């Protein structure tokens, strides 16, 4: 209707509608492309963003998510078939341990490899269970010394220097790598689980670690002041030793005093005693059950598609002991890593390996596959990043170490699926193990420790190159926990 109550011509009304729609379109384009001051969200931007809120078709999913877990709704039901648990190449099974609420997967996996090697040497007639807390104790003491000595070494730098901040931000943790397990076992020996069982604070480390970290930060500031005051090296080292005495006291109260001597009887896999009880020290037990130095016998390989393959890299300060070995690795394509693993498994040798285990993990079945969950369908989007992009953006990286124990090969000798011994207890997953498809293995497997005798001459030679140093802040160089 017109202003005076008269009907407007239909053609004029259509012209008005067309003009209004055109102006609205121009207006929307204008504020959609208009830059905001300082990159913030303006009211116009917010109005545009809010158009992506819940649509009528989303109501069912939104209501379901209000009362259910995301993974339960994103689960691919077609993937809930009965798992094929047959493996064409499999090493002998061994007992599954539980790291509980601690970040010691690297130590559990490392000791799993050592005890499997011992059983293999004795044709599975004798077995041993190593104490994890024994090496955990010295791991924490050594890391405390690494932090304090690192602070001394960098005391001439300002407090906001990147390396200084590295030490104060990460004074101590219970994560690590196989290199740390090797250094600690060689230096302090090993003991059986019966000689030093797990106390509460070994299985629940967060509070103990927080308190020791706080003390180390306090000590670090004191050492910086001593260096600034031109105190002698002798005085500084003497004070550092006193500080480590305090840390040692905190560790003994929490974890118990490390055993120095013990009596032990070896047993077979059925628990029957083999031989008479014998006295051991941690070092003599290492000689008896490991029998040789670990460093120099293995190659750590890694898949990092961001960097050139067949090059060796070393991570600065990524070690457990100040006088130990930095984490050094050879970067290889996944096809090469898979062949190294297959060769080892065919000779009944288990391996330390690490993964981004939280990705696409079916926790109920202990199954890892790329299509376990369809999050894209649930949220009407896609997640297209490849492995290199995920690493570069901190979306993925090595987070958890497990013991590679089996592979299933097709008729052409190509891997179809893999199995690992986990450290989340025997009731988790497949009797304490996880099964993963080869596609998932290629996407989320990162580190593998291989005995040199299973490596080609090319791999051994490449691993001996002078390594390129990389910083511990790199997205990929997280500790296995």
Which ranges hold each PLM region?
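Bacterial Sec-dependent N-terminal signal peptides
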Residues: 1-35
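Second-shell loop/turn segments in exported
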Residues: 91-103, 166-172, 323-331, 340-341, ...
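Post-signal peptide N-terminal segment of secreted/secretory-pathway proteins
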Residues: 81-154
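N-terminal regions that are enriched for targeting/export leaders
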Residues: 35-95
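Papain-like cysteine protease catalytic cores
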Residues: 132-262
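Active-site signature of cysteine proteases
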Residues: 34-36, 230-481
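Structural recognition of the beta-strand scaffold that forms the well-ordered cores
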Residues: 107, 134-137, 183, 192-195, ...
């Amino acid at each position: 209707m017109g202003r005076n109550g008269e009907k407007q011509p239909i053609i004029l009304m259509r012209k008005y509608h067309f003009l209004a729609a055109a102006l609205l379109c121009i207006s929307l384009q204008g504020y959609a492309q208009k830059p905001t001051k300082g990159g913030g969200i303006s009211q116009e931007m917010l109005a545009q963003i809010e158009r992506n809120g819940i649509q009528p078709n989303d109501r069912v999913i939104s209501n379901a998510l209000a009362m259910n877990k995301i993974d339960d709704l994103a689960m691919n039901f077609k993937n809930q078939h009965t798992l094929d648990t047959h493996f064409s190449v499999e090493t002998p099974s061994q007992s599954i341990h539980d790291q509980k609420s601690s970040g010691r997967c690297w130590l559990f996996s490392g000791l799993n490899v050592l005890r499997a090697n011992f059983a293999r040497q004795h044709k599975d007639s004798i077995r041993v269970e190593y104490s994890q807390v024994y090496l955990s104790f010295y791991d924490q003491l050594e890391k405390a010394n690494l932090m304090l000595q690192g602070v001394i070494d960098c005391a001439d730098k300002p407090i906001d220097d990147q390396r200084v901040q590295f030490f104060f931000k990460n004074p101590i943790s219970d994560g690590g790598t196989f290199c740390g397990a090797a250094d600690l076992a060689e230096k302090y020996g090993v003991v059986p689980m019966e000689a030093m069982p797990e106390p509460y604070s070994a299985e629940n480390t967060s509070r103990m670690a927080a308190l020791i970290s706080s003390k180390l930060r306090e000590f670090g500031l004191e050492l910086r002041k001593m260096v600034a005051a031109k105190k002698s090296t002798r005085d500084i080292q003497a004070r550092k030793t006193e500080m480590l005495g305090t840390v040692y006291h905190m560790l003994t109260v929490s974890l118990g005093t490390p055993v120095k001597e013990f009596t032990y009887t070896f047993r077979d896999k059925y628990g029957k005693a083999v031989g008479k009880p014998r006295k051991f020290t941690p070092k003599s037990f290492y000689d008896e059950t490991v029998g040789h130095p670990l460093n120099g016998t293995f190659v750590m390989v890694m898949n990092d598609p961001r960097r050139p393959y067949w090059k060796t890299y070393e991570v600065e300060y990524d070690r457990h002991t100040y006088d130990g070995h930095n984490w050094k690795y050879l970067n290889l394509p996944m096809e090469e890593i898979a062949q190294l693993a297959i060769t080892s498994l065919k000779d009944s040798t288990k391996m330390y390996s690490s993964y981004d285990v939280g990705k696409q993990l079916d926790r109920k079945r202990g199954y890892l596959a790329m299509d376990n969950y369809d999050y894209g369908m649930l949220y009407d989007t896609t997640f297209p990043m490849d492995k290199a992009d995920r690493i570069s953006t901190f979306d993925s990286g090595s987070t958890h170490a497990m013991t590679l124990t089996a592979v299933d090969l097709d008729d052409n000798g190509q891997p179809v699926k893999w199995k690992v011994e986990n450290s989340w207890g025997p009731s988790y997953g497949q009797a304490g193990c996880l099964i993963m498809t080869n596609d998932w293995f290629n996407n989320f497997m990162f580190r593998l420790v291989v005995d040199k005798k299973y490596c080609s001459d090319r791999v051994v030679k490449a691993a001996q190159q002078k390594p390129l140093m990389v910083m511990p802040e790199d997205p990929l160089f997280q500790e296995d926990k």
